[in-house]
Structure formats: C-alpha cells, structure tokens
Regions:
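Catalytic cores of Mg2+-dependent Asp-rich isoprenoid enzymes
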Residues: 1-165, 171-248
C-alpha cells in the first residue's frame, strides 16, 4: 500500500500549491503530466519553509526551521518521511538526483528571514540565490530528466528567471515587507524616501533577468516549455502593472 502514501503525499503538495500560488498552479498545468507531481513536490517543500519564517508568528521560528531542516535530511537519507510534504519532496530529490547543496542553500536563505534586516548587496545576492535561483535549478533538474549536459547549458538561464520572479515579488511587496516584517531586501535603497528613480533602477535590473530567462525558456525540453512560459507571462503581466504604478 506504499503507493497510496506516495500518491496521498503528492496530492497534499498539489493542494498546498493551489492554495498558495496562482502563478505556479497555472504553470504546472501547462507542463507534461509526468512533470506535474515532481514540481508540486518542490513547491510544497519551498512553501512550508517560507511559511515557517513568514507566518508562524508567536512560535519559535528558529527551532521550527532547524527541525524542518533536520527532518528534510532525514527524509532524504532514509527515503521516507511521516511528513507527507517531505516524503513527496525526498522522492523528487532522490529520483532526479537534485544536489543537496541546492536544498541547503535554499534553507539558509529562509534562515536569513528570521532576523529583521536591511540587506547589503552581498546579502541581497545571497538571498536571491537561495530563495529563488536554486529553486529554479531544482525544477530544471526535473525538466531535463537526467540530461546533465542540458542542465548545465540551461543553468544560468533558469537562475535568471528565478531571480526575476523573486525581484518582482520584492517590488510588489516592498511596502508590506518594510512596514510589517521590518525587511528591506533591495540594497542601497532608502524606503522612507523611495522615489520613481529608485524604482526604475530596480525595474531595469529585473528586465535584464527577464530577457535572459526568456531565452532559456525557448531552449527547454518541449514537455516543460509551455508551463514555464505560462508562469513567465503571469509574472511579465505583473511586472508591467508594477511599472505603471508610481513609487508612492
């Protein structure tokens, strides 16, 4: 009956994805059916870690994140977990040989969110790498299906697309992050005096990432291309809306 636990775990990650992310949900529906459950598995894992640091207020977030991190490695080592999210995720990681360094880099970026901070350039780049770029690489491992040469070819493009998506999230949520969570992700930006010039500089940086990300989409295997393009168009439309919105 293990297959029933496998499928139930996959469905839980699918429910999490649909509850939390319109863009990911739409994009996944555009993927080849064989790719959908693995990507749901990655998103479910990423979402739970993000929720620990962003919404588990009133609880010991540091302890919870460390426990989740430890449980992740136990699941990967043992090939099973009583946590359905981690069980589904470990199957994806072990099936597609996703490098564990990507997972640790992601979780390290979540750990950065435990402290209210204004990010330096180096911290900003480290956070983008961990919170977005390596997630793109996890997905890319699934998309290329074991073709290491294709993975290496598309790595810089996948990283730039993940970077663009995350920076758009930052720009969309800039006020809430600053006023509610005490975070300032963009380096060298004074959010108490945020103006159109500062906003435009960020947008120009995002546009560069977007262009390179699109080039990578065109090179993806056919089964993944349309789904990633849907997510790209969702974020591109959001980006256009943000660019039309004044800084204040």
């Amino acid at each position: 009956m293990m297959h029933l636990y496998h499928s139930s775990s996959d469905r839980i990650n699918k429910l999490i994805t649909r509850a939390y992310s319109t863009s990911f949900s739409l994009g996944i529906l555009g993927l080849n059916r064989s790719l959908r459950d693995p990507i749901y598995g990655i998103y479910g894992f990423v979402r739970v870690a993000d929720e620990i640091v962003d919404t588990f207020h009133g609880f010991d977030k540091d302890t919870l994140l460390k426990r989740f991190w430890k449980d992740t490695h136990l699941a990967l080592d043992e090939g099973v977990s009583t946590n359905p999210v981690l069980h589904s995720f470990q199957r994806v990681v072990n099936t597609y040989q996703i490098d564990r360094s990507l997972i640790d880099t992601f979780l390290a970026s979540m750990e950065m969110d435990l402290d209210d901070r204004t990010y330096s350039q180096a911290e900003y780049e480290k956070y983008i790498l961990g919170s977005a770029e390596v997630v793109g690489l996890m997905c890319l491992k699934v998309f290329v299906g074991g073709n290491q040469a294709k993975y290496e070819e598309l790595t810089p493009f996948a990283m730039k697309l993940g970077s663009a998506f995350q920076k758009i999230n930052f720009l969309r949520d800039v006020s809430a992050d600053f006023n509610t969570l005490g975070r300032t992700y963009f380096p060298n930006v004074d959010l108490t005096a945020f103006d159109d010039d500062a906003k435009r500089a960020i947008e120009e940086d995002i546009a560069v990432d977007f262009r390179m990300g699109y080039e990578g989409i065109l090179r993806l295997p056919k089964g993944a291309r349309f789904g990633v393009y849907i997510a790209y168009m969702y974020y591109y439309a959001l980006f256009q809306k943000i660019m039309r919105t004044p800084s204040t």
